[in-house]
Amino acid sequence: MKEVVIASAVRTAIGSYGKSLKDVPAVDLGATAIKEAVKKAGIKPEDVNEVILGNVLQAGLGQNPARQASFKAGLPVEIPAMTINKVCGSGLRTVSLAAQIIKAGDADVIIAGGMENMSRAPYLANNARWGYRMGNAKFVDEMITDGLWDAFNDYHMGITAENIAERWNISREEQDEFALASQKKAEEAIKSGQFKDEIVPVVIKGRKGETVVDTDEHPRFGSTIEGLAKLKPAFKKDGTVTAGNASGLNDCAAVLVIMSAEKAKELGVKPLAKIVSYGSAGVDPAIMGYGPFYATKAAIEKAGWTVDELDLIESNEAFAAQSLAVAKDLKFDMNKVNVNGGAIALGHPIGASGARILVTLVHAMQKRDAKKGLATLCIGGGQGTAILLEKC
C-alpha cells in the first residue's frame, strides 16, 4: 500500500467572533488557504486530483462549499471537490479520507482541510416557507442548532463538558488552571512568531483600503487565574464550565496538501511528515468530549506505538474538562500537549479545527525536531477522531 505524506500545511489566522473576518465567507477563507498550500507544496494546480474540505455551518453558503473554494482558488474546473461534515472532526477526517483514497490507488495528490465562519452563520425561519398565519415567529440560530447543540439529549455542548467534570471529578480550579496555561502558551507563541510559517494572511478590501489579517485574534493576553475565577458558570447554575475554560466561536480555514510518497518524489517535493495511522470512535453523546480517548487508542494500536513515544500532542480544547479527562486517562505528558496553546486560547472554528490543529502540529514538529505527533479532537454527537504523524 502507498505511503502517504503531507507536502504543505497552512492556515489563515483565527478570527474572533464578529471581528476581523466576520464579513469573509468561509469559501473565501478556504480559497486563500488552498492557494497558499499549493504554492508552498511547490506543485501546479493541475497536479491536484481532488479537493476535500470540512465545513459544518453550511446553511446559506451555497452548493458544495468545497467546490466553491476550489474554484475561487483557481484550480482547474476538471478537479472534483467534496464537502465533509463530521462536526468538529470534519477538518481532520478530510485528511484521513484523503490518505485512504491515496492508499487505495485512486489518487496521488489531494487537497484536504476545513473552513468555517461562525460569525456568518444565519438565523433560520423554519416555518416561513408555508407562511406564518398569525402571531409571533421564531428564528433559530443555525450556529447553535447545527454546530453546538446535542441532537440526542437536546442540550448545549457545554452540558456535555459539565457531565464529564462531574463524572471524572474535575474541579473548577483544575479547569481554570488548564485554561490559563493555554492562554499563556498561545501568548508566548504569538509574540515569538511561532505561527508565522503556518499562517497565510487574509487581505480584506474596503472603502478605506486593505486590511490584512495575519494574527490570531482570540487569545486574551495577560490572563490571570483571578480573572478566570470571577467568571460565572455558562451552562449550569452550579456548574464549573465557563466562557474562560471553554473554547471560543471563531472563523478560520486550514488546508494541507496530501500526497503519495512516490508522487512527491516524482515531483521533487520534500514532504513535512508521513501519515502513519488514524482512528475514529463513538461514545455516549452525553460525554462527547471523551471521544479522543478511544480514537487515540485506535490510532496508537494501528501504528504499534505507545503514548510514551509521542513527542508532541495536539488535543483540541473544546472544553478544559474534557481535555483533562482525556489527558489523564491516556496518561499524556502535559509538557507535550498543545505547546503553543489550544482552542481555549486560539479558538475553535468547528469545521476547520481538525485541520488547524494538524497544521499547527506539523509546523511544531518541524521547529522542535519532534519525530512523532498526535492530533485528536472530540466531536459533537459523541465521537472522536485522531491522526498520528511521523516527521520526514
Curated annotation (Swiss-Prot):
CC per GO annotation: cytoplasm
Function: Catalyzes the condensation of two molecules of acetyl-CoA to produce acetoacetyl-CoA. Involved in solvent production.
Record's subunit section: Homotetramer.
Residues of the active site: C88, H348, C378
A Pfam family assignment: Thiolase_C
Protein location: Cytoplasm
Activity regulation statement: Regulated by a redox-switch modulation. Reversibly inactivated by oxidative stress through the disulfide bond formation between two catalytic residues, Cys-88 and Cys-378, which enables the enzyme to protect its active site from oxygen radicals and be reactivated upon switching back to a reducing condition.
InterPro entries in the cross-refs: Thiolase, Thiolase-like, Thiolase_acyl_enz_int_AS, Thiolase_AS, Thiolase_C, Thiolase_CS, Thiolase_N
Catalysed reactions listed for this entry: 2 acetyl-CoA = acetoacetyl-CoA + CoA
Known outcome of mutating A286K: 3-fold increase in thiolase activity, prevents disulfide bond formation under oxidized condition and results in the loss of regulatory mechanism based on redox-switch modulation
UniProt-recorded name of the protein: Acetyl-CoA acetyltransferase
Residue ranges of the TM segments: none
Species in which this protein is naturally found: Clostridium acetobutylicum (strain ATCC 824 / DSM 792 / JCM 1419 / IAM 19013 / LMG 5710 / NBRC 13948 / NRRL B-527 / VKM B-1787 / 2291 / W)
CDD domains hit by this protein: thiolase (cd00751)
GO molecular function (one): acetyl-CoA C-acetyltransferase activity
Family indicated by similarity: Belongs to the thiolase-like superfamily. Thiolase family.
EC number: 2.3.1.9
NCBIfam families the record matches: AcCoA-C-Actrans
Binding site for acetate: S96, G279, S280, A386
Intrachain disulfide bonds: C88-C378
EC top class, as a word: transferase
Keywords: Acyltransferase, Cytoplasm, Disulfide bond, Transferase
PANTHER family assigned: ACETYL-COA ACETYLTRANSFERASE, CYTOSOLIC, ACETYL-COA C-ACYLTRANSFERASE
